[in-house]
Amino acid sequence: HPGTAISLAPVAYLLYQKVLQIDPHDPQWLGRDRFILSAGHSSLTQYVQLFLGGCGLELDDLKALRTWGSLTPGHPEYGHTDHVEITTGPLGQGIASATGFAYAQRFERGLFDPDTAPGESPFDHHVYVIAGDGDLQEGVSAEAASLAGHQELGNLVVLYDANQISIEDDVDIAFSEDVAARYESYGWHVQTVDFGESQQYVEDVDGLLNAITAAQQETGRPSLIVVKTIIGWPSPTKQNTGKIHGSALGADELALLKTAVGMNPEETFVVPPHVLDHTRALRERGQRLRSEWDQKFDMWAAQNPERKALLDRLLGGEVPDLEALLPDFSDVESMATRAASGQGINAL
């Protein structure tokens, strides 16, 4: 699935280098933003940025893409590759899961730090999603989007790669609705960044960054940013086709693409040291963000010792006197299974 990884490279680069609050050295940092690649089939979109940013992947890992035992399986897998927040692949599931992530963040914020001004709490973070046409076609994403709008999850930002191509070529054979209007009806904040707005295709990362900044400031509604792209651009003969969605470029097209972007078509897997030095400055940026967050967190912990103790217990997976919390059915002669299950779940 090279097409989306090629045309969304500037979008993913922008997220990792300029937007996401992450620490490459600590993928479990409590204060991190969460990134979910709902378009999990385009796993290279994320893997390349994890390599460039020094987040645990190296060039040999990219060479081992989609091979048994590698850190770069065909779809991102949670618990297998650092900085992958959740396993994705089934279309639409990533948007639905991200809604749950955003809901959980708001619950966490309300539990531990409800009175601090927005943006000032160590428990403030955003959930960012990259999704494609296939994700937006699925019913599960529609249901989740409806819930996210109803719950006013302003910490959720979805970047929708609207390239209008699927593995069956143009999506107009099955998908022609006004997605922006649909999400507006769900109660979302909707913006559009069109890379093809002018006569010449321009990867308008500045416009996209402005849209993301506006989404971050929209605290009462989830945000959808419709990014209109050409899949596989600037691949000379396969861009904007279903072939580049799910099939390898092939040696001839790859050589043409490298030539088009000023690379040596005879070289493979070459990343100039100065490029890596630049992108891996993400590590220093992450440490700076982490240091600033640590100060906020330490101040919160000093002012809220009981809440800090609760946080430590929850992070440690400790449930005090669990058996005493569970309902006792020893004297019950008859009860519907669903009722007993409900009592047990509610107690937990």
Go through the PLM ranges and name each one.
Residues 1-127, 192, 276-348:
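Thiamine diphosphate
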Residues 22-26, 32, 80, 84-281:
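Glycine-rich ThDP/TPP pyrophosphate-binding loop and its adjacent helix/strand module
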